[in-house]
């Protein structure tokens, strides 16, 4: 039985391109894996808490700190990490908002990049960190206005979503990160259907590779 974790972060609950693509991916995944379990987490409707001082103190607390103290503060982080760890594959809807991640997706990343759970301190100055999560494929559905911030676009260097997710996920062990990109239709209505069709074809190409992995 294969488990797919679907994370949506678009502020648009309707008319969202990334939600459309994550839904399409989940449908195609279920068609390939007939006994699949699809776990849906909407980071917009149920946003993770942001990091604060009690969280930092609990995350870096000494091992002999009472469990009840840590568990109360880190409950949301534990839930998200347990969910991520249990998944065989992950699909993320991540539109480009003001050059970077939607705030709710950034909060999610902050909750899952956690010392002792998803990475360890090695004590070795040459290699100070070690990833703790088992490898699994991650597919990111991303959308940017008119495509100018997608690879090859005039403003691609301003797109911080792809390097941010690649770095953060790779840091905790998820190094197989693939991107499916679609241009929004703010200015070029004619190009939008072609971009969306190309993104849906990309999904069809990725799935067999994941199944064979």
Swiss-Prot record:
Cofactor annotation: FMN
Cofactor note text: Binds 1 FMN per subunit.
Chemical reaction(s) catalysed: 2 a quinone + NADH + H(+) = 2 a 1,4-benzosemiquinone + NAD(+); N,N-dimethyl-1,4-phenylenediamine + anthranilate + 2 NAD(+) = 2-(4-dimethylaminophenyl)diazenylbenzoate + 2 NADH + 2 H(+)
UniProt KW keywords: Flavoprotein, FMN, NAD, Oxidoreductase
InterPro entries: Flavodoxin_fold (IPR003680), Flavoprotein-like_sf (IPR029039), FMN-dep_NADH:Q_OxRdtase_AzoR1 (IPR050104), NADH:quinone_OxRdtase_FMN_depd (IPR023048)
Residues given in the record as FMN binding sites: 10
Keyword NAD: yes
Origin: domain of life: Bacteria
EC annotation from Swiss-Prot or TrEMBL: 1.6.5.-, 1.7.1.17
GO molecular function annotations of the record: electron transfer activity; FMN binding; oxidoreductase activity, acting on NAD(P)H as acceptor; oxidoreductase activity, acting on NAD(P)H, quinone or similar compound as acceptor
SUPFAM superfamilies referenced in this protein's UniProt entry, alphabetically: Flavoproteins
Task of the protein: Quinone reductase that provides resistance to thiol-specific stress caused by electrophilic quinones.
Subunit (UniProt): Homodimer.
Family named by the database record: Belongs to the azoreductase type 1 family.
Protein name stated in the entry: FMN-dependent NADH:quinone oxidoreductase
Organism: Opitutus terrae (strain DSM 11246 / JCM 15787 / PB90-1)
